[in-house]
Amino acid sequence: MINLAKRQERGSVALAQIAEEEKISMKYLERLFAGLKKAGLVKAEIGSGGGYKLAKSASKINIYDIIIALEGSLNAFHCTDDKEKIYCSKFCNCEVTHVLLKVEQAVSQTLKKIKLSQLL
């Protein structure tokens, strides 16, 4: 995303070029960009000179949205993940879980304030 943000004024860039510059495999990069595209953070341009570019200004994309697009959630702890709650018999009465939820909320709020443009 930083690579695209740096080129924002110059148009789209081919994934192969990003893969080469960032030393990332094409297959992995294709998976990342599928998630970013689905989330509306990047868009693909087809044809000669085509490739990917940011779907909106880097100043309007926050880091939280990028992480959610790539990871699906921000749950750092198993016991705070909705899917895992059913496996924890102590969830509702666990003091640690409530602290961890507060930590995750603080991290989420912070990441929502950081814009992609700030990383340039």
What is each stretch, according to the model?
Residues A55-L120:
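Non-DNA-binding regulatory cores of transcription-related proteins
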Residues L41-A55:
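Beta-hairpin "wing" of winged helix-turn-helix
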Residues K27:
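Key DNA-contact positions within bacterial/archaeal DNA-binding proteins
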Residues E20, K37-K38:
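Alpha-helical residues within the helix-turn-helix
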